[in-house]
Amino acid sequence: MSNNQILFERAQKTIPGGVNSPVRAFRSVGGTPRFVARAQGPYFWDADGKQYIDYIGSWGPMIVGHVHPEVLDAVQKVLADGFSFGAPTEAEIEIAEEICKLVPSIEQVRMVSSGTEATMSALRLARGFTGRSRIVKFEGCYHGHADSLLVKAGSGLLTFGNPTSAGVPADIAKHTTVLEYNNVAALEEAFGAFGDEIAAVIVEPVAGNMNLVRGTPEFLNALRALCTKHGAVLIFDEVMCGFRVALGGAQAHYGIAADLTCLGKVIGGGMPAAAFGGRRDIMAHLAPLGGVYQAGTLSGNPIAVAAGLKTLQLIQAPGFYEALTAQTKRLADGLAAEARAAGVPFAADSIGAMFGLYFAERVPTSFAEVTKSDIERFNRFFHLMLDEGVYFAPSAYEAGFVSSTHDDAVIDATLAAARRAFAALAA
């Protein structure tokens, strides 16, 4: 029995499902999860000492690779000064200034500890600002596990939403309307029916939790125009795509300004940190200035802020995003070419340092299209690549991530492994 198996069996005795986040359990792909012992650059090593090329990077934060020496140094410098204070620090101001500089639509920002906290707080703020209750979200977009966001569409376009998780009361879910991603007609119909009841529309401008699906410019511009017309707050959930698709996030890529933005992952440099921010007039409704309550004991934790601030400084290096985007595109295009050579139906896409792999004829534009991919073939591919020492997301519904440490040699090794994996799939 491998060390991974031993640890997984042991974990299941004291941790529900043996993991602290469901996707880690390998339920989607089968098999035994890899327990990570250490990581460096583009690699990690599991409990059995096997090395893997890592294309998850903690689900996005590790944009400069694992244990970057400058991030490590920044963290080590603050450790001796204290782990947590529950009081303001100068470093909180510095990271807020950096975020506001890099994302111009964010005039003020509040630090929190997780993406779920960021989206949950942004929705409460939007409701407090507008005095409205209805929320609009989109099928396939994941915004954390707050009750009002664990909702799926009802039986008709304009019906009440239904909970997607046990424990979410229908009375909460009914305030959330779920529409199809990238469907402008459905969006216009919803705003025509109840636009003046909508407190906020929350969207991943580049979705990463139904695999990688890009928002179309037409869709995102329609969102911006309709929210402005009806006085609804447009919330871009950039917890995943923020500082991944461009230095200023998806807003910089598309040239669209949100009213509120949720950030996470990269801004913590691998530490538990997230944030929400936006227009000054909206943020002024937060306590202690306004009546919308939000708080957190560990918000702005000095260690997390140190890691995040150094990461934000590193990604501003000249040519950083050009090189990272080119490497990610080389990976995606190379995988598609290897599949094509083997005669395996497959598509790949990339934007910035995110990529998507689909066992389908073309790149999907909605959750419904993603579900038509060959999941069984993806699962086989995942395990073939895992055996080769390449670690992709253990689910056909998750995006992948490249770091600045994924150099040509790493990409070449990945494509060579993929060539063998696709040949096995085609056999």
From Swiss-Prot:
PROSITE patterns: AA_TRANSFER_CLASS_3 (PS00600). GO terms for biological process: protoporphyrinogen IX biosynthetic process. Belongs to the class-III pyridoxal-phosphate-dependent aminotransferase family. HemL subfamily. Gene3D superfamilies: Aspartate Aminotransferase, domain 1 (3.90.1150.10), Type I PLP-dependent aspartate aminotransferase-like (Major domain) (3.40.640.10). It is found in: Cytoplasm. It comes from Burkholderia multivorans (strain ATCC 17616 / 249). Its main location: cytoplasm. This is Glutamate-1-semialdehyde 2,1-aminomutase. Coiled coil: none annotated. The modification N6-(pyridoxal phosphate)lysine is found at K265. GO terms for molecular function: glutamate-1-semialdehyde 2,1-aminomutase activity; pyridoxal phosphate binding; transaminase activity. SUPFAM superfamilies: PLP-dependent transferases. Pfam families: Aminotran_3 (PF00202). The keyword Cytoplasm applies. Its EC number is 5.4.3.8. InterPro entries: 4pyrrol_synth_GluAld_NH2Trfase (IPR004639), Aminotrans_3 (IPR005814), Aminotrans_3_PPA_site (IPR049704), PyrdxlP-dep_Trfase (IPR015424), PyrdxlP-dep_Trfase_major (IPR015421), PyrdxlP-dep_Trfase_small (IPR015422). Pathway: Porphyrin-containing compound metabolism; protoporphyrin-IX biosynthesis; 5-aminolevulinate from L-glutamyl-tRNA(Glu): step 2/2. The keyword Hydrolase does not apply. GO terms for cellular component: cytoplasm.
